From Swiss-Prot:
Site (Transition state stabilizer) location in chain: R14
Organism (species): Klebsiella pneumoniae subsp. pneumoniae (strain ATCC 700721 / MGH 78578)
Entry similarity comment: Belongs to the 4-hydroxy-2-oxovalerate aldolase family.
A biological-process GO annotation: L-leucine biosynthetic process
HAMAP family documented for this protein: HOA
Stated name of the protein: 4-hydroxy-2-oxovalerate aldolase
Residues covered by the Pyruvate carboxyltransferase domain: 6-258
Residues where Mn(2+) binds: D15, H197, H199
Swiss-Prot/TrEMBL catalytic activity: (S)-4-hydroxy-2-oxopentanoate = acetaldehyde + pyruvate
Amino acid sequence: MNGKKLYISDVTLRDGMHAIRHQYSLAQVQQIAGALDKAGVDSIEVAHGDGLQGSSFNYGFGAHSDIAWIEAAAAAVSQAKIATLLLPGIGTLHDLKAAYQAGARVVRVATHCSEADVAAQHIAFARELGMDTVGFLMMSHMISPQALAQQALKMESYGATCIYVVDSGGAMNMNDIRDRFRALKAVLKPETATGMHAHHNLSLGVANSIVAVEEGCDRIDASLAGMGAGAGNAPLEVFIAAADKLGWQHGTDLYALMNAADELVRPLQDRPVRVDRETLALGYAGVYSSFLRHSEAAAKRYGLSAVDILVELGKRRMVGGQEDMIVDVALDLLNRNK
């Protein structure tokens, strides 16, 4: 770590959206953003779980617009930067500009790990706006470390100043993370930062984040009480406690984070965010974590097991954006069971 300060990127108000089907109220967003700001995090990501303009029939409708959520969070902070997420093809340049005008100063442009080239325009435009521009390679477990590094290079060439390894399926272990960071570091410019976005489906969210930092990672994504898709993200308060024990500089108030997690966030969970039969299946099968609630709904509708649906999705190598295939898989299983 050599005494550098970690950049703590909170995702409670974006990835955490998945855990409550994108239903945060504006008051809740203000309360949580305010608490995170006081606790000293560097950035607070705010958007529908699937990024700007994710509110849709396919992904689930949000209680509010991204812009309303971003404005609410921006009004509640004095130190932290407001971040947002954009998936090219869902969000447009127009949406990014609107988010910037509403107060977002960091954008993470997210693509499937093998499709960095779809982000070129959005990354370039974010740089033009003067935003802190991050490339976000989702489902990073699905390609080799060397292939991932080539995609990271593309994002860097478009103008991203930080590249993330994103374990959307919560499917990687510490060796997988180590290998990917070494591969990225071997090809990226020394001034290009790196980040880690973990999911806790195999209970390795914190361990994987620690290994990333050991390999030179600069930014860590985490959320209060792990609020996020699947078994959630690396729980922020747990990661900070572990980082503290390691003597790492993080600039946040552990007790304030612990209080916010238990008093503000955990009570909102209508389905516990934890490792259980279904969320473990996500990590084991390497499935996109936000498929959880959609698969549980399909299982209920067709009288199937959510685990069977998730395992089949893993076999078919489905990725984010293919939510419509969940019903397809359910109907196939139904016919198979006849």
